[in-house]
């Protein structure tokens, strides 16, 4: 699996993410993808070949392995990382659309150089307006996917621990046989580590949702305050104009009266 390609895509989104979003990407890449590639795959590399049962019945080992491990831990984690990272593509596509619109407006407004158009792609897009809704929706989807996979993992492997001895009576085993898992303690440690990393990602995503909401409320309050101050300033200017205009009228009336008296 090309994890470098996935990281390149996520890094493109990372430029337009919040500070919490950047921490989330670091946790995903360093503590999950790197561990999955560097360590976990070697630990689970012999899971099927080293799974043995105390019987010589052909097919019993394979049937018992499939019964207790319907899907490999490695494949389940890989699928989880891919699906959890997918919502970030929504943000990437939205940012690309906004940058395309900005380039289009620049071309229509004036003659621009290719270098200026290339610079548009490097600009950080502010998370506001429709992009805010896209971004917060992607974070919500990440939370849902993480929680769903943790629940699926619990349904498939109750207790999240690797059992050393398994009792299997599935056909074609002649009777209840004992099956043994290789390196159960090491696999349990990696399982707990990956689940803790998944829990940390959920906490970071929830924190990012609250951060985005607080940021939006702050911008709204600032706009309301600025519009209120502008409105008060406008009213004060109108009042000053009225006062100034009234004093001018009074002076004009007094001057006309003085001229009339002098003429008389």
Curated annotation (Swiss-Prot):
Keywords assigned by UniProt, alphabetized: Cell junction, Cell membrane, Gap junction, Membrane, Transmembrane, Transmembrane helix
One Gene Ontology MF term: gap junction channel activity
A GO CC term attached to the entry: connexin complex
PROSITE patterns, per the entry: CONNEXINS_1, CONNEXINS_2
InterPro entries for the chain: Connexin, Connexin32, Connexin_CCC, Connexin_CS, Connexin_N, Connexin_N_sf
Keyword Metal-binding: no
Tissue: Lung, liver, intestines, stomach and kidney.
GO BP, one annotated term: cell-cell signaling
Cell location: Cell membrane; Cell junction, Gap junction
Residues exposed to the Cytoplasmic side: 1-22, 99-130, 215-264
Extracellular side stretches: 46-75, 154-191
Topology relative to the membrane: Multi-pass membrane protein
Keyword Transmembrane helix: yes
Membrane-crossing residue ranges in chain numbering: 23-45, 76-98, 131-153, 192-214
Gene3D superfamilies for this protein: Gap junction channel protein cysteine-rich domain
Subunit and interaction comment: A connexon is composed of a hexamer of connexins.
Protein family per UniProt: Belongs to the connexin family. Beta-type (group I) subfamily.
Function text: One gap junction consists of a cluster of closely packed pairs of transmembrane channels, the connexons, through which materials of low MW diffuse from one cell to a neighboring cell.
UniProt protein name: Gap junction beta-1 protein
């Amino acid at each position: 699996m090309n994890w470098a390609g996935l990281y390149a895509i996520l890094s493109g989104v990372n430029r337009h993410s919040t500070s919490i979003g950047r921490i989330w990407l670091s946790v995903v890449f360093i503590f999950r993808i790197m561990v999955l590639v560097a360590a976990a795959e070697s630990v689970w590399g012999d899971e099927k070949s080293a799974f043995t049962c105390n019987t010589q019945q052909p097919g019993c080992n394979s049937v018992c392995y499939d019964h207790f491990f319907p899907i490999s831990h490695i494949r389940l984690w890989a699928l989880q990382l891919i699906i959890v990272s997918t919502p970030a593509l929504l943000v990437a596509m939205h940012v690309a659309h906004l940058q395309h619109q900005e380039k289009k407006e620049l071309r229509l407004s004036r003659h621009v150089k290719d270098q200026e158009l290339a610079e548009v792609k490097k600009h950080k897009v502010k998370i506001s307006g429709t992009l805010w809704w896209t971004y917060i929706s992607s974070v919500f989807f990440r939370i849902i996917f993480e929680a769903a996979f943790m629940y699926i993992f619990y349904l498939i492997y109750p207790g999240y621990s690797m059992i050393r001895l398994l009792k299997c009576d599935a056909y074609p085993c002649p009777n209840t046989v004992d099956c043994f898992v290789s390196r159960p303690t090491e696999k349990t440690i990696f399982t707990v580590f990956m689940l803790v990393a998944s829990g940390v990602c959920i906490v970071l995503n929830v924190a990012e949702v609250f951060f985005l909401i607080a940021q939006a409320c702050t911008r709204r309050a600032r706009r309301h305050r600025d519009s209120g101050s502008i409105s008060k300033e406008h009213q004060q200017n109108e009042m000053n104009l009225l006062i100034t205009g009234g004093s001018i009228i009074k002076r004009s009336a007094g001057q006309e009266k003085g001229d009339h008296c002098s003429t008389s």
